[in-house]
Amino acid sequence: MGQNTKIEWTSNGDTPGHTFNIVWGCEKVSPACDRCYAEAWAKRAGFSLWGKGGERRVLSADHWRAPMKWNAAAQKAGKAARVFCSSMADVFEDHPTVSEQRARLWPIVAATPWLQWLLLTKRPENVRGMVPREWLKAWPSNVLPGFTAENQEWFDRRHADAVIDHIDPIVRFPWFVSYEPALGPINFGGMAGISWLIVGGESGGGARPMMLG
């Protein structure tokens, strides 16, 4: 995983996007996690990485060099490339291994201005305390935080955590929302602070119905 991805919303026009994972593994926190594709993918690869006390797979040095190569290619092309981080984990999970690897990520983000980092989380309440402090004074232009919302309950909770509870006079940064999997209707009338909405359903055997609203 990590070279050009087929995830449509990572594309920037005709420039394909990438996925980058700081670890593999996570803990399920809401109904959106119940049929986690990343967990299934990891199990097929022979890894048991899910759960609060579970291990997290740390990735190779070569894997960590990839963003610099993507940045150089984007700069040469004169067009930014998007990077979904992390498709096999949650960057803002409160886990010791994730914390160690997250600290490795921030210097890479700073060194890759031609990459637009899409940091999608189900834990927006953790973002403010886990990003570098200087980001809260001047949010990086190449970083877009996002949160998953599968139904009205989880949109309201995460929107409050992300946009309402954490706004102050120092920083106002835009968020995107992944309404995927769409498990129940959502009234997006109160989308203050949201710059982009992604919509999708589950796929594969046993996929739950897509419930748009």
Regions found by a protein language model. Give the residues of each.
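N-terminal [4Fe-4S]-dependent radical SAM core
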Residues: 1-82, 90
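Conserved AdoMet/S-adenosylmethionine-binding subsite of the radical SAM
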Residues: 63-213
